[in-house]
UniProtKB/Swiss-Prot annotation:
UniProt gene name: rpsK
Function summary: Located on the platform of the 30S subunit, it bridges several disparate RNA helices of the 16S rRNA. Forms part of the Shine-Dalgarno cleft in the 70S ribosome.
Similarity-based family: Belongs to the universal ribosomal protein uS11 family.
Alphabetically ordered keywords of this record: Ribonucleoprotein, Ribosomal protein, RNA-binding, rRNA-binding
Keyword field contains Manganese: no
GO molecular function, one term: structural constituent of ribosome
Biological source species: Ruthia magnifica subsp. Calyptogena magnifica
Taxon lineage: Bacteria, Pseudomonadati, Pseudomonadota, Gammaproteobacteria, Candidatus Pseudothioglobaceae
Protein name (database record): Small ribosomal subunit protein uS11
Keyword rRNA-binding in record: yes
Length: 127
């Protein structure tokens, strides 16, 4: 039986992208997309080896953003626009982690959804 010729997988080269940082109180998720919103790579604190309460630390966010930045560099990415969502402790350190990988950050935008008196918030914690 003759072998069919296999096509070599063409590697996408994307220079500009958007880094979406979703920082909650329990976790930090970093996702890098192209300009159209198609996902290129993503990383979360749990996937970077942090478990439990250590997932919510700023250091975990920095390591997570660094690993996602490495994957983006493999696609030839150079420039990033950063969009931060959420009130978590890993907001600033995730941006530092992306910057440490050598990616040029063009702008930082806060896209945290703010309700105009929408849903009723959950009850206050009594500790």
């Amino acid at each position: 039986m003759a072998k069919t010729p296999t096509r070599k997988k063409s590697k996408k080269v994307i220079i500009d992208g958007i880094a979406h940082i979703h920082a909650t109180f329990n976790n930090t998720i970093v996702m890098i997309t192209d300009r159209h919103g198609n996902a290129i790579c993503w990383s979360a604190s749990g996937g970077s080896g942090f478990r439990g309460s250590r997932k919510s630390t700023p250091f975990a966010a920095q390591v997570t953003a660094g690993s996602c930045g490495e994957k983006a560099l493999a696609f030839g990415m150079k420039n990033l626009e950063v969009r931060v969502k959420g009130p978590g402790p890993g907001r600033d350190s995730a941006i530092r982690g992306l910057n440490a990988q050598g990616l040029k950050i063009q702008s930082i935008t806060d896209v945290t959804p703010i309700p105009h008196n929408g849903c009723r918030p959950s009850k206050k914690r009594r500790v």
